[in-house]
A protein has these predicted regions:
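Hydrophobic alpha-helical transmembrane segments of multipass integral membrane proteins
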Residues: 59, 63, 67-79, 83, ...
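Interhelical loop and adjacent transmembrane-helix boundary motif
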Residues: 3, 36, 48-57, 200-238
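Membrane-embedded alpha-helices of multi-pass transport/permease systems
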Residues: 22-25, 29, 78-82, 116, ...
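Transmembrane alpha-helices
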Residues: 11-12, 17-24, 147-150, 157-159, ...
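N-terminal, non-cleaved signal-anchor transmembrane helix
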Residues: 1-56, 60-63, 67
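Transmembrane-helix boundary motif in ABC transporter permease subunits
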Residues: 1-5, 71-103, 120
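Membrane-interfacial helix termini and adjacent extracytoplasmic/periplasmic loops
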Residues: 46, 112-141, 173, 209-212
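Amphipathic cytosolic juxtamembrane alpha-helices at the membrane-cytosol interface
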Residues: 2-4, 67, 91-100, 157-190
Length: 238
């Protein structure tokens, strides 16, 4: 009975991996096809990759996307870690629950609503849309992710560690830098990489706040097929 259950679990695990990775493998394989569609493989070619690396605009957009992701993730990690420490330090349950609820608003809100809200906010404050607006938006929706990653690690930490360090003469800065931060570092790294992933993956929020002359990789990838399909569907003048 145990062997049978083990085999079924392995089969289920393999099915999950196939569902997750088969589309990616499919895209990679057909990226080497000479054809322009993904119906049939028309022969091996490097042409698509040559065109990709020859596209200076796309390379610049890729670098901007990486820069946005790294900056927003780093700043969101710092702010989110401080926020998690602040939430954990509150003594009143009502205050703590209120702060957690406010933190989770961006997590449960639809991306379209968040993007439209940021657009209205930046327009009202006359903040130009571009690199700065995208960076601020990515920081804002990444902070709750970092808080949710760091806060459980803080709550796991025993207060006896802090009490012992304080009894040995450690000040507040030493408690933070030498005890708290090293202990919660796994949560900080998890929050950073989660924020980095969300920033690289985001499309809906970024689409609203990019403005003219600036784009990220996800927005560019979406807009190019739209432009091609629009051009093909436009009737020729007679």
């Amino acid at each position: 009975m145990t062997l049978r259950n083990f085999k079924w679990r392995n089969l289920y695990l393999w099915l999950v991996f196939i569902v997750l990775y088969a589309p990616i493998i499919f895209l990679v394989v057909y990226s080497f096809s000479q054809g322009t569609t993904m119906n049939n493989f028309h022969g091996f070619t490097w042409q698509h990759y040559q065109d990709l690396f020859a596209d200076s605009r796309l390379i610049a957009i890729f670098l901007d996307t990486i820069l946005i992701a790294l900056l927003s993730s780093l700043l969101a990690t710092v702010i989110g870690t401080l926020g998690a420490l602040g939430i954990n330090s509150t003594t009143k349950p009502i205050t703590r629950n209120t702060l957690l609820s406010l933190n989770n608003i961006l997590m449960v809100s639809p991306d379209v609503i968040i993007g439209a809200s940021f657009l209205i906010f930046f327009t009202a404050l006359k903040i130009p849309l571009g690199f700065g607006s995208v960076l601020l938006s990515h920081i804002a929706f990444s902070i709750p992710i970092v808080v949710l990653m760091v806060l459980p690690k803080i709550q796991e930490m025993s207060t006896s560690l802090l009490d012992a360090a304080a009894d040995l003469g450690a000040n507040n800065w030493q408690l933070l830098s030498q005890i708290i931060v090293p202990y919660i570092m796994p949560g900080i790294f998890s929050g950073f990489f989660m924020a980095l992933t969300y920033s690289l993956d985001d499309f809906a929020v970024t689409f609203f706040v990019t403005g003219n002359g600036f784009s990220t990789l996800s927005v560019e990838i979406y807009s190019r097929p739209v432009k091609v399909s629009t051009w093909k569907s436009t009737p020729c003048p007679v």
